[in-house]
Amino acid sequence: MLRRLVGSEMCIRDSAHIGSQIFELEPHEDLGEIMVKVILDAKKFGHNIKELNVGGGLGIKYTTNDDPPSIDEWVKTISNSVVKACKKHNLDLPKLMCEPGRSIVSTAGITIYKIGAFKEIPGIRTYLSVDGGMSDNPRPITYQSNYSACLVKNPFNINSKNKYTIAGKHCESGDVLFKEIELANCETGDLICVFGTGAYNNSMSSNYNRIPRPAALLVCNGEAEIIQKRESPIDLLKYDVLPDRFIK
């Protein structure tokens, strides 16, 4: 690729993507060294790369079992790696950029579900259903992703001795948001708050089984405004067209 770009002025930046939800710092340290080596290789073909975009990949704490590094630790690791490698090879420091997505926006969002029915299978588990599921959050069924949650009326999960499997409303055996999550005693109509849904949930949402998307609200300093209206059944049908040949 570098050879094919000889004579081009477009080769000024090297961009990378090494993965997602990464909890270790070593891969990012290695990335800094590798990207500086790309600068060296590019120089052999007359290119002067002045910018390095290390992408993102920093994980977040979805559950108590997750232990990601801080953003400060991540930035320090990458920048130190690039500085060290540039010094070793006598290179000018490039402009260093990153694309932190999930690590910033995920914890800025929560999802609220309302509890509907309960189903207890004695000696096995207790199911509770909510008014959402895989259409607004496909990540559990797609990636086996885990989240933290609490009852809105009991945000600190005091006396959380009950285990529930929380299922969605989509008539799918895989439409399960939580398996055996510990919560305080729940009742029909209670609200469940799921944390860390600010990234991917909205962008990956769908109208599977003709389920309308929920509304989105912006909450700041005690005020809340709708920033995405709740969809209605009419919204789901307005783009459907019946061909004239079927109309008698």
Residue ranges and their predicted role:
Residues 9, 42-47, 84-91, 119-122:
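Short helix-capping segments at alpha-helix termini
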Residues 18-19, 52-59, 98-102:
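Glycine-rich beta-strand-to-loop/alpha-helix junction loops that act as flexible
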Residues 24-28, 63-73:
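Glycine-rich tight-turn/loop motif centered on a GG-T
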Residues 13-24:
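Conserved strand-turn element in the central/C-terminal portion of the radical SAM core barrel
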Residues 77, 83, 91-248:
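Charged (often Lys/Glu-rich) extended helix/loop segments that serve as interaction or gating elements
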Residues 32-42, 77-82:
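Short, well-ordered amphipathic alpha-helical segments that serve as non-catalytic structural scaffolds
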Residues 8-9, 24-39:
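Active-site/ligand-binding-proximal alpha/beta "capping" segment
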Residues 1-7, 11-12:
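Single conserved hydrophobic/aromatic residue that forms the stacking wall/gate
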